[in-house]
Amino acid sequence: MLYALATGLSAIFTPLNALTYLTSRIILGALTALLLSIFCGGKMIRYLQKMQMGQFVRDDGPKTHLKKAGTPTMGGALIIFSITVSMLCWADLRSVYTWLALFVLLGFGAVGWTDDYLKLVKKNTKGLAAKQKYAYLSLVALLTALWLYFLADTPIETTLIMPFFKHFEWQMGILFIPFVYLVLTGASNAVNLTDGLDGLAIMPVVLVSGGLCIFAYLSGSANFALYLHIPAIAGAGEMAIFCAAIAGAGLGFLWYNAHPALVFMGDVGALSLGAALATVAVVVRQELAFAVMGGVFVAEALSVMIQVGSYKCRGKRVFRMAPLHHHFELGGWPESRVTIRFWIITVVLVLVGLSTLKLR
């Protein structure tokens, strides 16, 4: 809205042109989401406390987590609100990518919100039935995959790009649809599994969104894309604003989620953020680079798959407890050490992911 207003009034007051540049809108998108998240966070926490929407803690997990019982959750709604307002202010509302991003964010967020609501308000400790939850997530992911497939104007928009290789590409055709479906559902659940310690999931989300913001900015420029041998995607610049808003809202949420956390994001935040990052990666054709940058999320998800598979096949567990962060906790690592080391790993992985821009 503010972008459209600045565009319309720039002919009368030329300094407003500065607000129409993509770089300006990226910065303003991040700042808007950050400030909204910080200033609205306190009120949301008090509301959640008043409504007694406190976290349920399993008694078979690390004993240090028992003190977290009752901490307000569903704080992810604050993140979604901040991102949405920021996008409506600074993104180009004529761009289909703006609405695609919001559709995924709100769609996955709605499933997570329903799950959290049933757990916390209706006191149904299991929330949505597993099949129900999977069906709803699958529906949103499949609609997104179909949207992107039929939106594609050029073959490159449905081509899988291999990092570190300049000419290794695979035109997926109709297989693009199930591929996108798997990327979205996989990423959303991976972030959800990572969200088990104070600040553990949100900082990697911020860091990965920063990396994807750079990819989106460069892919949206035909000149940069040609120089770097990456796909040129018209309109991808709006996804850079989306990434900036995610990073800003995430940092604002971390203000309250840092140890000891005053609020947790819940499924409403984790599912939506994972899918949002995956959507950006799909649009800019950097799914494999996204897997590298989000290596912490991948490791957390794989640890659960390995643990379950090993127990079912051999009757033995590979890890002390899954997801992976609990394995280290039960090994004697303090919560803050696990969290910060996972942050450091993510910084390194994001840099490795960005290095694919030149190392080909």
From Swiss-Prot:
Compartment(s) where it occurs, according to its Swiss-Prot or TrEMBL record: Cell inner membrane
One GO location term (cellular component): plasma membrane
Membrane topology (UniProt): Multi-pass membrane protein
Alphabetical keyword list: Cell cycle, Cell division, Cell inner membrane, Cell membrane, Cell shape, Cell wall biogenesis/degradation, Magnesium, Membrane, Metal-binding, Peptidoglycan synthesis, Transferase, Transmembrane, Transmembrane helix
Domain of life assignment: Bacteria
PROSITE patterns referenced in this protein's UniProt entry, alphabetically: MRAY_1, MRAY_2
Record EC number: 2.7.8.13
InterPro entries documented for this protein: Glycosyl_transferase_4 (IPR000715), PNAcMuramoyl-5peptid_Trfase (IPR003524), PNAcMuramoyl-5peptid_Trfase_CS (IPR018480)
Catalytic reactions on record: UDP-N-acetyl-alpha-D-muramoyl-L-alanyl-gamma-D-glutamyl-meso-2,6-diaminopimeloyl-D-alanyl-D-alanine + di-trans,octa-cis-undecaprenyl phosphate = di-trans,octa-cis-undecaprenyl diphospho-N-acetyl-alpha-D-muramoyl-L-alanyl-D-glutamyl-meso-2,6-diaminopimeloyl-D-alanyl-D-alanine + UMP
Protein's UniProt keywords contain Transcription regulation: no
GO biological process, one term: peptidoglycan biosynthetic process
Molecular-function annotations in GO: metal ion binding; phospho-N-acetylmuramoyl-pentapeptide-transferase activity; UDP-N-acetylmuramoyl-L-alanyl-D-glutamyl-meso-2,6-diaminopimelyl-D-alanyl-D-alanine:undecaprenyl-phosphate transferase activity
Main localization category: membrane
Pathway(s) this gene product operates in, as recorded in its UniProt entry: Cell wall biogenesis; peptidoglycan biosynthesis
Transmembrane portions of the chain: 19-39, 73-93, 95-115, 136-156, 173-193, 199-219, 233-253, 263-283, 288-308, 338-358
Required cofactor(s): Mg(2+)
Pfam families: Glycos_transf_4 (PF00953), MraY_sig1 (PF10555)
Role, per record: Catalyzes the initial step of the lipid cycle reactions in the biosynthesis of the cell wall peptidoglycan: transfers peptidoglycan precursor phospho-MurNAc-pentapeptide from UDP-MurNAc-pentapeptide onto the lipid carrier undecaprenyl phosphate, yielding undecaprenyl-pyrophosphoryl-MurNAc-pentapeptide, known as lipid I.
Classification via HAMAP family: MraY (MF_00038)
Family: Belongs to the glycosyltransferase 4 family. MraY subfamily.
PANTHER family named among the record's database cross-references: PHOSPHO-N-ACETYLMURAMOYL-PENTAPEPTIDE-TRANSFERASE, PHOSPHO-N-ACETYLMURAMOYL-PENTAPEPTIDE-TRANSFERASE HOMOLOG
Protein name: Phospho-N-acetylmuramoyl-pentapeptide-transferase
Source lineage: Bacteria, Pseudomonadati, Pseudomonadota, Gammaproteobacteria, Cardiobacteriales
